[in-house]
Amino acid sequence: MIKTILPGKTIGIIGGGQLGRMLAMSAKEMGYKIAILDPSDMCCAKIFSDIFIKANFDDFKKVEELCKHSDVITFEFENIDADALSKLEKKYNFVQSSEVLRITQHRYYEKEFARSLEIPTVDYIHIEDNTDVEID
């Protein structure tokens, strides 16, 4: 369950790219502190961070360090270890769940989920490997 956080609290963002930058910029304008984890010193969201952790996204200890500095944690993309997130979400306040992450990491599951909610999608087929494809 997500708890309400008020300005002055810290939002942790895994990923310092364009989406992280937009979130950090808006949050700073509202009075929040920002902690960012990204492997690049040159990530575009770094300029808005109060705390910056340079680390790969699969570095469990560094991701947990970000969590310890944060009142709520989010991620800007789906290239994160869902199993690691599953462990961390039991202890820390994540906006997205590991289950949501697992769905967004696989386009077929993503489309199936959208259709289960009656959200229109383009037609698609499920292909597991090259034996599922006929080439003339």
Task: Kindly give the residue locations of the regions a language model identified.
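ATP-binding N-terminal substructure of ATP-dependent carboxylate-amine bond-forming enzymes
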Residues: 1-105, 109
